[in-house]
Every structure is written in C-alpha cells, then in structure tokens.
Amino acid sequence: MKRKLSLAEAVEAARILFEMNAGEQGVLALAGRASLPHDTEEERTRLLTEWRAFAHASVMYALMACAPNVVVVEYLRATQGMLRGLGCSADEGEEFVDGAFSAYADPLVRLQAQECPAVFFRRLLGWEVSEVPAQNAAVVSGVMAMVLSAVMDKLEQYDYALE
C-alpha cells in the first residue's frame, strides 16, 4: 500500500530528492569520473549550476508524471527558497530558472530525456556529445538516466492526499 502524502509532505519529499541528487560532493565526484572541468571556482560553479538544473528539472518531470498539478506548482514555487539555501541571490535564482533549468525542463516535458546529456555538454563545455570522449559521455548519460529513474521510482511510491 502506498503512503499518502499531504501537499506539504509531497513538496518536502520532492525538495529532499532534489537535494540528494544535487549535492556538491556527489556532483564533484561525477566530474572526476567523467573528466569534467571543476578545478577552479568558476568551473565548479558552472558545473554545479548545470547539474542542479538537471536535478531540479528531473524532480519536476517526475512530479508531473506522478502527482497532481498542485504539487508541481508548489514545488516550483519553492525553487527560490531552495536556491537561497544553496547560496544563490534572487537574481542568480532568476537566471537559473530562465536559463539552465529551462534548458533541461524543455526536453523532459517533450518526453525527450535522451537529449539532456547533449544539453549538459553544450551548456557546460560548448561541445556536442560527439565531441566528448565516449567514456565521459557514457558516465554522464548513465548517471543522468539513473537520477531520472530513481526520482521517478521514489515519487511513484506515494499517493497524494490533497483534500
């Protein structure tokens, strides 16, 4: 039997899933495995922004598939607070939503998740996937697929009791 979540619990569960999949330590470990630039502060910031945008879009997509629309709306409303918790200013939050997040949300809502690695490499490195060493592209693509699948699996475990 599925556990029933209230609106507040559903948004909190989504927020936790975002945090679990967007943590700095995990993203930097991925960068090391995939030979992504992350030595300078600027490189780390760009990498974290791109990965967090993908993670946020993944949670939004899974909510769209599993939960009532009101949960999606409330999760998206919580975005600025989540970004402030990561040290982003209001302006940086707006840039994140309008730029990086939108870049990943677009293929996901079109049911074209396979485009996300191309978006990632294009935005982070200015390269097409074909220009990225195959092993590095496979690592990033595989982790993206696992994140999306894990978030979807987790959110499918709940019923949403919003009355």
List each model region and its residues:
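Short, compositionally biased low-complexity segments
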Residues: 50-51, 72, 119-121
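N-terminal interaction modules that seed assembly of large macromolecular complexes
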Residues: 25-68
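Long, hydrophobic alpha-helical segments that serve as membrane-spanning/inserting helices
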Residues: 144-159
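Helix-start/N-cap signature of alpha-helical segments
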Residues: 6, 44-48, 93, 113
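Acidic, serine/threonine-rich, charge-biased low-complexity segments
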Residues: 1, 38, 133, 162-163
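Polybasic, proline/glycine-rich intrinsically disordered low-complexity segments
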Residues: 10-27, 76-146, 163
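N-terminal leader/targeting peptides and immediately adjacent processing regions
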Residues: 1-41
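Short, solvent-exposed secondary-structure capping/transition elements
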Residues: 60-74, 88-92
